[in-house]
Amino acid sequence: MLSANWPWLESLRHLGLCRALDRHLVLGCLRVYQQQIQTLKEDEAEFLLFWLTLCSGQVAQGHICLDIELACREPASLLPSGTLPYGMAYQEVKQQLQANPFAQVLQGLQAHPQLVGPQAPFVLRGHRLYLRRYASVEQQIIEFIEQRAQVQLPVPVPVLAQ
């Protein structure tokens, strides 16, 4: 069973990087995953909980995804506007972010395709982690922009002469 008593979890909340809803969403996913598919070791559960909760929290801040590469490289980039990168809570989250190099984070997430995959609650595309519903919305926007870019709109000759 998941303990969910990791100190960095309270630090995420304190910094405004997650809400109770984010934590409960991820804990629910992990519990279903453990019951139906595989038992997770405590360190695997902690790793997944951290990154998936952070992703959900970024969506709550208005971002469409979590840029994992940026988070690993510049932890302060995750902070909500007006939050200063100081204090014990920030140091705890920064330490957790830097516990695994970027490539290991990607491998760790890809190792659990029932949680992070095309048909899973979370989708990994390149270095970005999405809640599945937002990954499809972003793709639809990209396709719409590409279609619009291919349409040749007539421009009146007098406008071209100016």
Give the location of each predicted region.
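Helicase P-loop NTPase motor core of nucleic-acid translocases
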Residues: M1-Q162
